[in-house]
Amino acid sequence: MLELNGIDKSYGTRKVLDGVTFTVGDGRMTGFVGGNGAGKTTTMRIILGVLSSDAGTVTLQGSPITAADRRRFGYMPEERGLYPKMKVLEQIIYFARLHGWKADAAKKNATELLERLGLGERLNDTVESLSLGNQQRAQIAAALVHRPEVLVLDEPFSGLDPIAVETVQSVLTDYAAGGAPVLFSSHQLDIVERLCDDLVIIAGGQIRASGSRDELREAHGSTRYELLLNGDAGWLREQPGISVIDFDGGYAVFEADSAEARQQVLRAAVAHGDVVSFGRERTTLAEIFKEVVR
């Protein structure tokens, strides 16, 4: 488990991180979301030791992170960091060799990884000849080629088309399934919602919310409930303690002034006919994000 506790960082009089605390669990995909300037990149750079914090600790499996630990990390910065005139395969092999891989093993793993990321036909092309989306895939390969035990990725889905997004999702999911803590930032909240197990929301250098998707929906989700019947739901308007927000035939959205009133709706729905679905109105990550950063 990767854990940050009480991380502070200031530049002069400007405090950019204020008590940042969260965990990235083993085998879990953790989405790190926030607006521009919220503190995501600074936090990631502190995790990697690129920047030092003014206060707080970063630990891995309960112990302070060492230089040896960080060599087992896979880090992808938001900025392009590849050599533009170098061939794609040669470059990824080079990154594997920097991590101590022997030449043959580095070439084999780099080739397999690039093929899986959809760059199998571009191995001998220079980086500068690739589209921005393919450059992003190559940059992801550079972060993964040494088979890291922890992943920290800053905007890995930026510039990717939907097919490439699915490809990268599959690769990252496999890393998490193998037990690696995976932390990634993204402005694409739909991707974060679909992919991650846990969410961390940061604004103004402070963590505004963190937890699993279900935990965040429970804490910050809608207070409305949805009912869908194979029949008319007009009777719902007469239920005590119920305010109907929306209604269309057998579909209704309502709020209840108590848990008992809500349960009474379910009992009445069963008595009136075939219940297709009943539950809390689904709240999107975008809606939760807007609420907690307000």
Regions found by a protein language model. Name each.
Residues 4:
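Conserved catalytic Walker-motif region of ABC-type ATPase nucleotide-binding domains
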